[in-house]
Amino acid sequence: MNQTLIICSTLNVNSQQKSKAKNSMKNTFHSNELSSIEQRQKYQKHLKKDKKTAEDITGVGNCSPPWRLISSVLFVVCLLLMAVAMVMTIFTTRLSSERSSSNIHQEGLHHPCPENWVWFRCSCYYFSKEKLVWRESQRACLSFNSSLIRMNKEEMDFFSLKSFFWVGVYYDETSKQWLWDDHSVLPSGMFSGLESSPKNFCASYKSKEAYLAENCSTKLMYICKK
């Protein structure tokens, strides 16, 4: 009888253990299944979130058509090109001006004029410090391989002097007119303020507004040109 009870007890225990094991397996399987479902739900939520983000980005892009971006880029490029063109123009102008100034400076430094002569417009000029009568002034210029200046309008505009100088103009009593010292007629309008004068009168020059008819025996400084 006791053995029968022991066997029954053992069977009951085994049965309970098996039942617990089954329940444990069921719970574990159920737990795993729930965990798998939760992971799927999280993954689906993540996909939906990514999809929504992508849609948002696409939506923003749709609000700004590609041609607007292209036009903005082209506008910036045009501004840059204009700036570069302006800089190049300024640089070229400045370089040209510097070269021109350099050429003028070099031309002044390397002019072919003798010492104490002035270079202007491809000619050399000598302004004397000594005073001579008109005929002696003429001979002095000839000794320098030059002549008393026969002025043109450009020289009259350029030379504005502090004193009166002899120039190559004299009054010819025979023809009753003022002539260059080579006996040629003055151009129209040159020294037009000089009036008819008696014999032995020559022209002295200070500026285009100041020139005189003076006795050729007067001693003045003189201007030579070659």
UniProtKB/Swiss-Prot annotation:
It comes from Rattus norvegicus (Rat). This is Killer cell lectin-like receptor subfamily E member 1. Heterodimer; with KLRI1 or KLRI2. It comes from the Eukaryota. The keyword Glycoprotein applies. It is a single-pass type II membrane protein. Residues 94-226 are extracellular. Glycans are attached at N145.
